Amino acid sequence: MTETLVFASAVDPVEPWRAALEALLPDVRVRTPEEIGPGDDVRYALVWKPPAGFFARHPALRLVTILGAGADALVGRDDLPDVPVARLSDPEMARMMTHYVLFAVLRYARDMPAFEAAQRAGRWHYVHPREAREIRVGVLGLGELGGAAALELARQGFSVAGWSRTPKALPGIDCHAGPDALVPFLARSEILVVMLPLTPETRRLIGADAIAALPRGAKLVNVSRGAVIDEAALVAALASGHLGGATLDVFETEPLAEGHPLWTMENVLVTPHLASVAIPASAARQIAENIRRVRAGHAPEHRVDLTRGY
């Protein structure tokens, strides 16, 4: 019997996913919502921010997989059926995220924004490099992606601390945990990398008070979700100089609105939510295995708890 997986994403092309998944699961057909016909037995969904009412059209679903590591876009939906929801946990996604974080941290550690500005001005500008061990990097969020990034930064020689909601232990990382540890963690972070999931507890966690706790001139990198940071407070801190710069891959509203002040701030680098994306050739294996598990009556791996948001 042939089953159907419905694929819904406004930013991901379906063809690579269709090819990868149908090669692994010959009895599953991958279809977009527009391709679904009366004879399709839709049992699985692979989605990224599907439109309102999407799930109500597919009452026989047995598994929903999110095209990414974050589940916040599905929290609170009234059309989501009572079926397992799984996130992607792909080594290639973790590697891609780590590369982006390393790029952003190295750019600040080696004073590249100052050299970029000097070049635009036609001015020779020397800043003596600091040793990596002298530069204090803080990774806010030590989950799968945050932990991998923190370990790579430590391997590169940076002085790395991490903060998480519950205690973690990572080799070479100065780990902090819980609300009382947040301000001391921020106070030692010259470069702050935000890697938290978006939950009710983390929404705007980095507001004016948290930003004020960072050292003056600190740099901020956000690769989590835009709403973890109070955007107005962020803009104010960048304008005042309390924050020396920001590398932002995520925003409260995406795409970032035309005319938003972040577009024209000289100390801000904007990228369009691409720090890490799912790679069909590698991630399809996890999706196929989870479909096999659900068929056999087992829970999928990397299941999301929507009450927590991750």
Whereabouts are the PLM-identified features?
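N-terminal glycine-/charge-rich "phosphate-binding" loop or analogous flexible N-terminal tail
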Residues: 1-43
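Phosphate/diphosphate ligand-binding glycine-rich loop within oxidoreductases
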Residues: 43-116
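Glycine-rich NAD(P)-binding loop of Rossmann-like domains
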Residues: 116-148, 175
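Phosphate-coordination loops involved in phosphoryl transfer and adenosine-cofactor binding
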Residues: 2, 82, 133-136, 217
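Short acidic low-complexity segments
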Residues: 29-41, 52-55, 173-188
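Glycine-rich, N-terminal phosphate-binding loop of Rossmann-like dinucleotide-binding domains
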Residues: 49, 68, 194-197, 223-224, ...
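Rossmann-like adenosine-cofactor binding region
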Residues: 166-261
